[in-house]
C-alpha cells in the first residue's frame, strides 16, 4: 500500500515561496496559491499539486469583478491562519493511499491540481 506525504509547501505569491513570508493585507479577504510537493511516504521525491486557498469574501469580490469564479481546486477558509490551513491540507494528504502512485495522485487531484492531471501516456 502506498501512502502520500507532503515533502514541501510553498505559496506562489511570495518571491521566496516560503509560506511564513506570506501575510495577507486582510486575513478575512485573501486568496493565494499553495504549491504542494507530495510523494510516496517511503521516497524522497514528489510531484506538484496546486491549490487555491481563499475566503468567502475573496470569492465574492472575484465574482463582483468578473461575474464568476471557477470552483475546482479551492480550499475555502474563514480567515488566514497558516497553521490551521496546513493542518487541514496535511490531514487530507496523509489520508490518501492506494495500490499505486497513480491511484494516490488521483485521490489528491480531487482537491488540488496535479501537474500531470489529464496527461495520457502512450
Predicted stretch roles:
Residues 94-122:
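C-terminal charged interaction modules
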